[in-house]
């Protein structure tokens, strides 16, 4: 198992992904995050449990493909990223939308 230092845990989780599908997954106590492409499932689990103080029961990851992006006559691409869907134990939640 890979040793992860607490200072690098925050670097593994980049941001939560808030899309229509990700919002529907919240009902099943599943949360979607963009993570570092080199992160492994045990590292992601350790990072989520440490940062949010929750119990993770499952993780599925997928590498999202590079998509072409055109702006005028210039053709480029969107960066590739890794998406992690994290399932929490029923008694835990993550507050992604804090009260204002």
Curated annotation (Swiss-Prot):
Part of the 50S ribosomal subunit. Contacts protein L29, and trigger factor when it is bound to the ribosome. GO terms for cellular component: ribonucleoprotein complex; ribosome. The gene is rplW. One of the early assembly proteins it binds 23S rRNA. One of the proteins that surrounds the polypeptide exit tunnel on the outside of the ribosome. Forms the main docking site for trigger factor binding to the ribosome. This is Large ribosomal subunit protein uL23. Belongs to the universal ribosomal protein uL23 family. Keywords: Ribonucleoprotein, Ribosomal protein, RNA-binding, rRNA-binding. It holds the Pfam family Ribosomal_L23. InterPro entries: Nucleotide-bd_a/b_plait_sf, Ribosomal_uL23-like, Ribosomal_uL23/eL15/eS24_sf, Ribosomal_uL23_CS. Transmembrane segments: none annotated. SUPFAM superfamilies: Ribosomal proteins S24e, L23 and L15e. GO terms for molecular function: rRNA binding; structural constituent of ribosome. PANTHER family: 60S RIBOSOMAL PROTEIN L23A. One of its GO terms (biological process) is translation.
């Amino acid at each position: 198992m890979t040793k992860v230092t607490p200072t690098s845990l925050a670097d593994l989780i980049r941001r939560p992904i808030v899309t229509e599908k990700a919002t529907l997954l919240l009902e099943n106590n599943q949360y979607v995050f963009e993570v570092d492409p080199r992160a492994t499932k045990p590292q992601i689990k350790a990072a989520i449990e440490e940062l949010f103080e929750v119990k993770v029961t499952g993780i599925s990851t997928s590498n999202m493909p590079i998509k072409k992006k055109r702006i005028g006559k210039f053709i480029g691409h969107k960066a590739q990223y890794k998406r992690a869907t994290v399932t929490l134990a029923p008694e835990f939640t993550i507050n992604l939308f804090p009260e204002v």
